[in-house]
Amino acid sequence: MNKTLSLLTLLTILPLMLMAQEDNDKDWAPRKGNIKEVVVYGRRPMKEIGLQQTRFDSLALKENIALSMADVLTFNSSIFVKNYGRATLSTVAFRGTSPSHTQVTWNGMRINNPMLGMTDFSMIPSYFIDEASLLHGTSSVNEVGGGLGGSVKMSTHALKQEGFGLQYVQGIGSFKTFDEFLRLNYGNKHWQLSTRAVLSTSPNEYKYRNHDKKENIYDEDMNIVGQYYPIEYNHSGSFCDLHLLQEVYYDTRHGDRLGLNAWYLNSNRELQMLTTDYGNEMDFDNRQREQTFRGILSWEHTRSNWKLSTRAGYIHTWMAYDYMRDVGNGNMAHMTRSRSLVNTIYAQNEGEYHLAGKWMFTHSIAAHQHFVKSQDKNIIQQDGGKGIVGYNKARIELSGSASAKWRPNDRLGFSLVLREEMYGTEWSPVIPAFFMDGVISRTGNVIAKVSVSRNFRFPTLNDLYFLPGGNPDLRKERGWSYDTGLSFAISREDKYSLSGSATWFDSYINDWILWLPTNKGFFSPRNIKDVHAYGIELQGNLTAKFPKDWLLKVNGTYSWTPSINQGEPISQADQSIGKQLPYVPRHSSAITFHLSWRTWALLYKWCYYSERFTMSSNDITLTGKLPQYYMNNITIEKNFSFRWADLSLKGCINNLFNEEYLSVLSHPMPGINFEIFLGITPKWAKRDN
């Protein structure tokens, strides 16, 4: 109650302060000459009133062809990325929440797996993404529901070039890793066509020191005189990932634009052995395969003060998990043959309307129809063909929103969003979100932002229907989130630009769903947790130009994220109350440092994660927590320009200081490793459109 009263007081007082400041600053423009070094940025977009947003620039997205969006998030945001190494499952903890609390969209279509509710960011090549941003906490309600932590928004777009274009990049790295990227494009004043392909392969056999095993040292009399941690090899982590992206755009030049985006992936990955596994890697095969197609047709109609867009899409995903063991004489027997088939039909309509330069109204309605079949082919079917393991279900998901945004003057802005969702036959209550921002000082473009929202997340299909263990009586997770922060931006033309932000967030999530063991020998989900996630997010960006063509860019983020279980104990032995959630670091930070001079460039990346607990009780034993770690990567690039082509040569060192670390318990990570990339872009006749 005290927090609510404080927020209401702030919402009441801040507009009055800003209106008063507006009266005092009506003659601010003539005084601009007194601060020549400061350039105040232009009018803030109506669509972004009060948003807490992080945008990734093209340098981060197009750094090299070996990177996935998991790598981009690791080094360019304060989100914790939980992964098992390259080409392994990579999920995120956004503001202290679980992976299923982060909603992910691609060109407007939600791509979270409907079975698990989460997204594997290792399956998204960063070279396929042209624009990406994070919407923190309450800000995600503008785009999608269910993002109790936030959302990741990704899109692709046309190059807007005339003529033919080609780009090819070949990468060779440690552990016999090969990466290839090819892009073909053609454009004229109406058409833009683009084809992109990424192929990554590797046996991925890296060595590591196994701190979960000890080998004895014997003297001549076979007495133990010492012990050491053995050096082992990751023999079962090979991967082969192929991604294809086809884009076709048609612009009438009269306000209408048609688009087609088609993305196909084919992945074959081994699942690596644990550091606690004493078996022989030749005695088993642990493999995950996936084939996914995502397609979107879009139409945009734009006029001077309004815009309409309609999209229709389809997702097909086939996933297989196979586990085989040697049963003797070299004969491999299937222990598990899990198969999942997901088909999703998608449709969305959006609109924007501007009125008198002070008002903006938006609407959006989206539908996702899922058809899911999950089974283990090794399990004998019951009578009637019903499986003992898995399920066969369909569910429709509707989401609609309307918003009104008002900017009474250049200093102040208000936004109200109302959203409602339906999953299956169950409707959520209305999801309100209120945003406000205001310019506190034009000198430095200091802006205050305040927002509050309600949100819900419905159980996933696995939560409800998986056999054995699914619980159809689960309640939807619900929560309230509060954000307040300050941002600034200053610059001096052709010299430097400096911007930054500080945000306090506070979230209360009730009926958190958790899978727990049962006395029947399997796990089942229950609504058992009330979680309080709060903290601070800091961001800073600096760009500086120096004489003789030197350019420096520095970006940094920091997050302090306590995420505490405040629910009731589920048993007398429950020691999780008042403790930090597993695999959520309290502190995380990342810095990128980019220095360029003419045709040379140096990129240094650093990230830090504090210790993470592996158990809800926050046990501090060797297996109860993972130590903090720092990661350092460095890249040097040289560009060459000839009459016939542009060439680039890039060398990367990952894990520069050969840090021994774990992101997930008992999963070894590679030490120092190297990559070289050679790129070529022929200079065919082409002009910017």
State the predicted function of each range.
Residues 303-323, 441, 449, 476-534, ...:
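Membrane-embedded beta-barrel scaffold of Gram-negative outer-membrane proteins
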Residues 186-286:
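Periplasmic-side early beta-strands and strand-to-turn transitions of outer-membrane beta-barrels
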Residues 249-267, 288-428, 435, 499-504, ...:
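Face-selective signature of the C-terminal outer-membrane beta-barrel domain
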Residues 109-137, 468:
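Short acidic/polar hinge/loop motifs at secondary-structure boundaries
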Residues 37, 69-72, 90-93, 105, ...:
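N-terminal periplasmic accessory domains that precede
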Residues 407-412, 503-508, 527-615, 646:
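Gram-negative outer-membrane beta-barrel transporters
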Residues 70-110:
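Extracytoplasmic beta-strand/coil segments of soluble accessory domains associated
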Residues 21-62, 99:
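Short, acidic, small-residue-rich periplasmic hinge/interaction motif at the N-terminus
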